[in-house]
């Protein structure tokens, strides 16, 4: 049994507590939050659990094995560092840290103390992303050409980060997981309209072998859109995460150049075949992720979404921010 302390009971924290509480080999012993209303909600939902306003109390508790940090990114480093120094495994909400130096320090600290870090990249545990990764690995899609994502909605405006640091970690972690290569350069453009932070942004990532990824993130959209297009040499797919049933659609469509003899003799064959929808398991990704974290702790394994994976995403976020500040200058990663 792994005993958890959860720090942060705002928007995402209740989901973390609920899913940990549902696992047979995990138990939430303590919840901390600085907000009186959040603590009241936690006490009402879990009257037998210790509720406190002091995160340090949770971190220092000798009966707690692991800490879940579900707080704003600017708090992640200090909380995670204290937890690791006190022998606690750490599950931390995305993005991992505010900068790469902090991420590297936490990774080294965890390694010295033989502790596990897991960064909450929840989408990697969805049935859709698992299926897409399988389709790439087994060659169904062929050589990958592009990843093109739109992740937009009205709000929720953040007071401490821009839209890139709020929404892009989802796609950047997915891209990192699927492509399995570091981007060579990142170009980002965006604009600030309301609260001093960029609320609209467009990020382009250039990878080796001609692979390109594009991510559109936006807090000022009248509609919520969660759509990703992935194109390969053999097949293409559309992933609409807002679809209840047919989240992933695979299209047997493609283009083949059959002749390059002169500019006006280009022969292009367009292939248009069937569309099919793979069956996806209906599971809550966060529960799968937390169960995997518990297994990694008990079995001494390193999770694939560990601190190093979190560092790669933070490195991409930093590059995107630098490009934003220079109005789209290409930044090496």
Each language-model region and where it sits:
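A contiguous active-site-proximal alpha/beta segment in oxidoreductase catalytic domains
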Residues: 74, 97-159
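C-terminal helix-rich "cap/oligomerization" subdomain common to oxidoreductases
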Residues: 66-71, 288, 292-333
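Beta-loop-alpha module in the N-terminal Rossmann-like domain of NAD(P)-dependent dehydrogenases
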Residues: 16, 49-109
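NAD(P)-dinucleotide binding in Rossmann-like oxidoreductases
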Residues: 191-193, 211-288
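Hydrophobic residues in well-ordered beta-strands that form the structural core
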Residues: 53, 92, 117-119, 148, ...
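Rossmann-like dinucleotide-binding domain that binds NAD(P)(H)
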Residues: 154-223, 229, 243, 308
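N-terminal Rossmann-like dinucleotide-binding module
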Residues: 1-46
């Amino acid at each position: 049994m792994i005993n958890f302390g959860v720090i942060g009971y705002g928007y995402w924290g209740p989901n973390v507590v609920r899913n940990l509480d549902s696992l047979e080999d995990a138990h939430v012993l303590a919840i901390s939050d600085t907000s009186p209303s959040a603590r009241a909600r936690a006490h009402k939902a879990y009257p037998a659990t210790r509720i406190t306003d002091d995160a340090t109390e949770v971190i220092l508790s000798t009966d707690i094995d692991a800490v879940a940090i579900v707080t704003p990114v600017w708090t992640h480093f200090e909380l995670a560092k204290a937890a690791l120094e006190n022998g606690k495994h750490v599950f931390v909400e995305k993005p991992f840290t505010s900068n790469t130096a902090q991420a590297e320090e936490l990774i080294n600290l965890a390694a010295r103390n033989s502790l596990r870090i897991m960064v909450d990249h929840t989408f990697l545990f969805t049935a859709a992303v698992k299926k897409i990764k399988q389709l790439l690995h087994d060659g169904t899609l062929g050589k990958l050409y592009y990843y093109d994502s739109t992740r937009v909605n009205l709000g929720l405006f953040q007071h401490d980060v821009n839209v890139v640091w709020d929404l892009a970690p989802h796609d950047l972690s997915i891209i990192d997981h699927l492509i399995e290569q570091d981007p060579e350069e990142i170009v980002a453009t965006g604009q600030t309209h309301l609260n001093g932070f960029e609320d609209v942004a467009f990020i382009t990532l250039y990878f080796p072998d001609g692979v390109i990824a594009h991510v559109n993130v936006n807090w000022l959209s009248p509609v919520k859109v969660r759509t990703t297009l992935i194109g390969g040499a053999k097949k293409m797919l559309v992933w609409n995460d807002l679809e209840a049933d047919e989240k992933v659609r695979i299209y047997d469509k493609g283009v083949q150049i059959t002749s390059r003899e002169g500019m006006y003799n280009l022969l292009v064959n367009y292939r248009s075949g069937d569309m099919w929808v793979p069956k996806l398991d209906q599971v809550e990704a966060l529960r799968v992720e937390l169960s995997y974290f518990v297994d990694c702790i008990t079995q001494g394994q390193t999770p694939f979404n560990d601190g190093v994976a979190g560092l790669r995403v933070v490195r991409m976020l930093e590059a995107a921010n630098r490009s934003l500040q220079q109005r789209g200058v290409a930044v090496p990663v």
